[in-house]
Curated annotation (Swiss-Prot):
One of its GO terms (biological process) is translation. It comes from Helicobacter pylori (strain P12). This is Peptide deformylase. Fe cation binds at C96, H138, H142. GO terms for molecular function: metal ion binding; peptide deformylase activity. It is an enzyme of class 3 (hydrolase). Binds 1 Fe(2+) ion.
Length: 174
C-alpha cells in the first residue's frame, strides 16, 4: 500500500467531473486500499478518488466507532453512486482534507438513499442519515467537481477566501 498525495484547494483538478468506473480489477482494489491508508493517515472520515488525482467515480467513507477507532472492515467503498432518494434538510459543520483547517456549516439532506457498486462490481443499496448521510453527500459532490465551500453563503465564502489568503501568506513565511 502507498500513501497518496491529497490535492488541495484551489487546484483545478478538484473541479474535474469524475468518470464511471468500468474495470473492477486488482488495480482498482489497490487504489481503494491506497485511498483508505491515505485517508486514515490524514485523519479523515471520507475521501473521493479525485482528491488523490484519480478522476473516477469512487469514494470511501470510514466513520469511527464509539471507541473512536476507524476499523478497515467498516469502510464503505462506494463506486458509481446514483441517487435514489433524498429527504429533509439539516445544517452540519463540515471540513475537508482538500481544504485543511477550515470548517463551516453547510445545508445537507437529512436522509439519503443511494445505489452503488462495491469493489467486486456488486450492486448495493444504502440508506443513511446523520453523519453518514452528510459524508456521502460531501464525497459525491467531489465526484461532480463541487466542494463544500461552494455551498457557503456569499458572506461565509468571503470569510473563507480571506482565511485562505492569510494561511497562504503564513505558509510562505515559514
Amino acid at each position: 500500500m502507498a500513501l497518496l498525495e491529497i490535492i488541495h484547494y484551489p487546484s483545478k483538478i478538484l473541479r474535474t467531473i469524475s468518470k464511471e468506473v468500468v474495470s473492477f480489477d486488482s488495480k482498482l482494489h489497490q487504489q481503494l486500499d491506497d485511498m483508505h491508508e491515505t485517508m486514515i493517515a490524514s485523519e479523515g472520515i471520507g475521501l473521493a478518488a479525485i482528491q488523490v488525482g484519480l478522476p473516477l467515480r469512487m469514494l470511501i467513507i470510514n466513520l469511527p466507532q464509539e471507541d473512536g477507532v476507524q476499523h478497515k472492515e467498516d469502510c464503505l467503498e462506494i463506486i458509481n453512486p446514483k441517487w435514489i432518494e433524498t429527504k429533509g434538510s439539516m445544517m452540519y459543520k463540515e471540513g475537508c482534507l482538500s481544504v485543511p483547517g477550515f470548517y463551516e456549516e453547510v445545508e445537507r439532506f437529512e436522509k439519503v438513499k443511494i445505489e452503488y457498486q462495491n469493489r467486486f462490481a456488486e450492486v448495493k443499496i444504502l440508506e443513511a442519515s446523520e453523519l453518514l448521510a452528510v459524508a456521502i453527500q460531501h464525497e459525491i459532490d467531489h465526484l461532480n467537481g463541487v466542494l463544500f465551500v461552494d455551498k457557503l453563503s456569499i458572506l461565509k465564502r468571503k470569510k473563507f477566501e480571506k482565511e485562505l489568503k492569510e494561511l497562504q501568506k503564513k505558509q510562505k513565511r515559514e
